[in-house]
Amino acid sequence: MSFNFLCCWKCIIHGNRFVVQVTGGSLEESKEALAIAETDGLFIGGFSAQLECTQLDARLVLFLETLSLEFEESGDPEKHFQGLLALAKEGIQKGKVVAIGECGLDYDRLHFCPPEVQKKYFEKQFELAYATKLPMFLHMRAAAEDFCEIMERNINKFTGGVTHSFTGSAEDRDKLLSFHNMYIGVNGCSLKMAENLDVVRGIPVERMMIETDSPYCEIKSTHAGINFVKSLWPSKKKEKYDKECLVKGRNEPCLVRQVLEVVAGCKGITDIDLFSATLYQNTCRVFFPQDLDAAADALLAGRNESQ
């Protein structure tokens, strides 16, 4: 397993705790991702220095990837669905599969999959969530109207979810927030322009999550909120790879701290630790409900310390 591949994991960090999300782009890749998720400590140690956190609670989890076009290309959509369902149930039993996704609608990249195929199998993917009682990890790009119509028809088929890497308008934001069990995920792509920051300001803290979406969606020097970034790491070009440095031009999991700083800055939040604890609690509520008590305790402790 290459270091490059490992650095494509998405990471959620809070203090001394972090969870790495592994995704697959197909049924076969999801099988491989589940195998990776079962390794836990074997790979986590390699990240500890880069993430600069103490390894107190380190886990790898799988979000079961469900690409719409793969249903068609399989030649037998129902058999493909049953294969995904069987894999999900296996992962649930092992305590590793925590969500269905990433799935949704992307009308910016129609060369990958036409909209009618996307809509047909996005609807089908809710059946996976219903059968497994898992939350959903969702993607919406330039498709808010169709996305929300499908969501509304299937709102009772899943326990909750997050629409990640949100880049939509204030109207799109408000449509998503109208679904009681939906959170909005923010990363570097959500923070490019001043208009994006205005939209993010309107996301209630209690309905927000943050992510890197590494190796994509880094916060660049041209981004509107760059002045809010405080945390920096040394980086080198990949040709001069150094395990003590980031790879220049590649978004890496530890950079979720920069997302936290920009969102806090644009929302005028000064207690970044309390903000971080709230986001962690939001994440637990959807994907790790077994950790909610610990998250609530951390949030309460943060409030007490600020008084």
Residue ranges, per PLM feature:
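Mid-domain alpha/beta scaffold segments of enzyme catalytic cores
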Residues: M1-Q307
